[in-house]
Swiss-Prot record:
Record's protein name: 33 kDa chaperonin
Listed PANTHER family: 33 KDA CHAPERONIN
Alphabetical keyword list: Chaperone, Cytoplasm, Disulfide bond, Redox-active center, Stress response, Zinc
One of the record's GO cellular component terms: cytoplasm
Major localisation: cytoplasm
S-S pairs: C235-C237, C268-C271
Record GO biological process: protein refolding
Pfam families per UniProt: HSP33
Domain of life, per lineage: Bacteria
Protein family (similarity comment): Belongs to the HSP33 family.
Length: 290
């Protein structure tokens, strides 16, 4: 089961989130049938949103949009504070050449664009922030958002590793944040450790990558595990929700669907689930509108 571990240095100077998101990204790949580069780009966005959602309280909903002008198109993810995330990538078929070590490239092909976050607290006034894509690697773009919009200096690492068949092998990441009151000496020590950390892809390839990430972040520094919470890919779509959407259409449009297509098929963008509405269903909707 996927999980996020929240921890804090015993000194109180830093906190870290470490994630195993393997099943989340694997299920997203399965539902959207994504090729290698699309899988990694979508996976990184899902992991970034899992981190962002874990930082919120209450029943907030968090939307992350990675909008680039490349062949990926846009990437949309929605998460809640209970560990659930869903998402899709506009172009599922991007399969760009890999590096000599087999890593999938994303950043050089993302193009120009923006990292957009929308945090809905349920009050009717969602908070929206837009920052430019800095590298297109998504992790660095997320870190830039946290620094610029939330005024919280953060180190982010996230990635998706694929096997020889381009299926998800492991996915995960981390976030380290400076907390108020950290001394310059403590900050310098952590900056040095982060600079010396092995690449995120190397740590994810470890036998137990969650422990490997924590060890790389803290080293000999004492720390406390604050919580361990489950994560999952879960879509909240339903037939009732799409039925309500159809009810917003004019009766003439519903009748046209009956006449031309003998009903309607609606496919959820986030999970690919198909909902069929036959002629009888459509006629019932028209009668309900009458």
């Amino acid at each position: 089961m996927d999980k996020i571990i929240k921890s804090i240095a015993q000194s109180g100077a830093f906190r870290a989130y470490v994630l195993d998101s393997t099943e989340t990204v694997a299920l997203a790949q399965e539902k959207h049938n994504t090729l290698s580069s699309s899988t990694v780009a979508l996976g990184r966005t899902l992991i970034a949103n899992q981190i962002l959602a874990a930082n919120q309280k209450g029943d907030s909903k968090i939307t992350v949009k990675v909008i680039g002008d490349s062949s990926f198109g846009h990437i949309i993810s929605v998460a809640d504070t209970k560990g659930h995330v869903k998402g899709y990538i506009q172009n599922t078929g991007v399969d760009i050449k890999k590096t000599a070590t087999g890593e999938v490239l994303v950043g050089p092909f993302m193009g120009n664009g923006h990292f957009v976050t929308i945090i809905d607290y349920g009050t009717g006034n969602p908070y929206t922030s837009t920052t430019p894509l800095i590298t297109g690697e998504i992790g660095e773009d997320f870190a830039y958002y946290l620094t610029e919009s939330e005024q919280t200096p953060s180190a982010i690492g996230l990635n998706v590793l694929l096997d020889e068949n381009d299926k998800v092998k492991v996915a995960g990441g981390f976030m380290v944040q400076v907390l108020p009151g950290a001394s310059e000496e403590e900050i310098a020590r952590y900056e040095k450790r982060l600079q010396e950390m092995p690449a995120i892809s190397h740590l994810l390839a470890s036998k137990n990558h969650v422990d490997a990430l924590l060890e790389a972040i803290y080293g000999d520094e004492p720390y406390k595990r604050l919580s361990e919470e489950p994560l999952s890919f879960q879509c909240d779509c339903s037939r009732e929700r799409f039925e309500a959407a159809l009810m917003t259409l004019p009766k003439a449009d519903l009748q046209a669907m009956i006449d031309e297509d003998k009903g309607a098929e609606i496919v959820c963008q986030f999970c690919g689930t198909k909902y069929q509405f036959n002629e009888s269903d459509m006629e019932a909707l028209i009668n309900d509108k009458a």
